[in-house]
Amino acid sequence: MNKILLFVAICFGTIQSIAQPKIYSTSNAHSHNDYEQKTPFYSAYDAGFGSIEADIYLIDGQLLVAHERSHVSKEKTLEALYLKPLAEKIKQNKGNVYPNKKQTLNILIDCKTDGVAALDVLTLLLKSYKDLITCKNLRFVISGNRPKEADYHLYPDYIQFDGRLGIDYTPEMLSKIAIVSDYYGTYSRWNGKDSLPEADKIRLTTMINKVHQLKKPIRFWASPDTPNAWEVFKQLGVDYINTDKIEELKGFLQKNK
């Protein structure tokens, strides 16, 4: 019985240490599958989001943005939807990604085809966008199909990677990890309504604690996308709140700092 109480106390202490309140803003918001928005890039950018996601397919030498290969269009390239608009914003902001010099932005690129080949094309393409690769508050974070972790150091500083908790990273590898993402369903089936079950809270906060011990921010994908869930994720200390509802999350974060 004493052992059980000790375990619960430790878990509760972990939850308390993680769930310390901090100031949240739209910098803590992640636009999931952003290209499916009515105005890709601009809606999330204008809302001040800290992370914007684009899925890419390398087809005939072009990086095409789509959720499924069957949905690709030659007009919807990564360059047209994201790189060119970013370059224009950085020019307007005199070298910064946002008018606020302290505000950062991750462009999370989910490679749906071979990651090494896609990265070769991406790094070559980015060389023609000097303002992007020299912008200190902009990072390109590679997710999905990625190179081997041992090869991360071969890529330039402006290319970083989306990490996974189960991988045993060396310090050199870890230095190339910008964020750790994980599938929400591994830890909970809670749908964002009513209260988060205590057992799920323990699983989620234990994982969050492990990521924070690595000094990395965390994001869950396929998580509930409701105001109640957003509030819970804030209390748990999730660094990037995943959403398809840009305007709704923007309003929530502005009202509930």
Residue ranges and their predicted role:
Residues 19-257:
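Phosphate-group recognition and catalysis centered on beta-loop-alpha active-site segments
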